[in-house]
């Protein structure tokens, strides 16, 4: 999982990326390509 300041660039990398909020943190998850996971830090 990458930790990034801005998730906008991470979201446009793949069309299956979803933005999810968990415990006050913002995550990018991708079921088809799990390598795209990222967290805003």
UniProtKB/Swiss-Prot annotation:
GO terms for biological process: translation. Signal peptide: none annotated. The keyword Ribonucleoprotein applies. Disulfide bonds: none annotated. GO terms for cellular component: ribonucleoprotein complex; ribosome. Pfam families: Ribosomal_L36. It comes from the Bacteria. Keywords: Ribonucleoprotein, Ribosomal protein. One of its GO terms (molecular function) is structural constituent of ribosome. The keyword Ribosomal protein applies. Belongs to the bacterial ribosomal protein bL36 family. This is Large ribosomal subunit protein bL36. It comes from Gluconobacter oxydans (strain 621H).
């Amino acid at each position: 999982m990458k930790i990034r300041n801005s998730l906008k660039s991470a979201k446009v990398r793949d069309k299956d990326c979803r933005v999810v909020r968990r415990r006050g943190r913002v995550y990018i998850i991708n079921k088809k390509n799990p390598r795209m996971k990222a967290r805003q830090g």
